[in-house]
Amino acid sequence: GAGQHGVATATVCALMDMKCEIFMGATDVERQHTNVERMKMLGAKVNPVRTGNMTLSDACSEAIRDWCCHPQDTFYIVGSTMGPHPYPDIVAKMQSVISEELKWQLEEKIGRDYPDYLIACVGGGSNAAGTIYHYIDDDRVQIYLAEAAGHGIDTNYTAATMHCGTEGIIHGARTLVMQTEDGQIEEAFTISAGLDYPGIGPMHADLATRGRSHVLAIK
């Protein structure tokens, strides 16, 4: 996607003297060149993925494929709340530092540890998961999530999974997916790197389905 997770992973691997291999869609390699150079400076090998739409979803597929082919010496590290359990849960808990900091900063600045509204963008869902994590069961807080509408949810050029998706399986997770009637994954469209994922983290699919979060498709 945008490459931030790749930079973070490359940094940790450099500190731990471990080999690091990053899979990134060729389209994203071009438009996020600065982050690619950071990864390389940290010693990571960056593999441009040239299949499909050459973006986030294709990079995830290649990373999982490589992991499955080399289980004896490879650990898969994903940066969003996607993939098979327990990955979505691990990522959400790690990202929950965002809402943890929100609580004490709000207490310090306004005298209470909760806001009226939380607003976050959502692609795979990691940043949004971290933002809302400690407030999910707090009904005083309204949750709004913004997903990329692309050219519009009534077109074939959109990444608004929670508006246009149906229940299915992508990268080992059962969630809302942009797919054809026979379950083939459709390509998501948006100019925003990191939001062009044709699925959504299961946590967000659940919250949206039961009305806990309000999802807006931003054009």
Residue positions per predicted region:
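Active-site nucleophile and cofactor-binding loops and adjacent substrate-binding regions
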Residues: 1-6, 24, 52, 95, ...
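Buried hydrophobic positions in well-ordered alpha/beta secondary-structure cores of metabolic enzymes
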Residues: 3, 13, 39, 102, ...
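Active-site-proximal loop->helix
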Residues: 5-62, 154-165
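Generic transmembrane alpha-helix signature in multi-pass membrane proteins
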Residues: 9-10, 130-132
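Active-site/ligand-binding loops adjacent to catalytic centers
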Residues: 60-90, 112, 137-140, 145-219
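N-terminal small/polar loop signature for handling phosphorylated ligands or for N-terminal nucleophile
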Residues: 64-65, 99, 103
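A glycine-rich, Thr/Ser-enriched phosphate-binding loop motif common to dinucleotide/cofactor-binding enzymes
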Residues: 86-101
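Phosphate/pyrophosphate-binding loops at sites that engage ATP/ADP/AMP, CoA/4′-phosphopantetheine
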Residues: 104-113
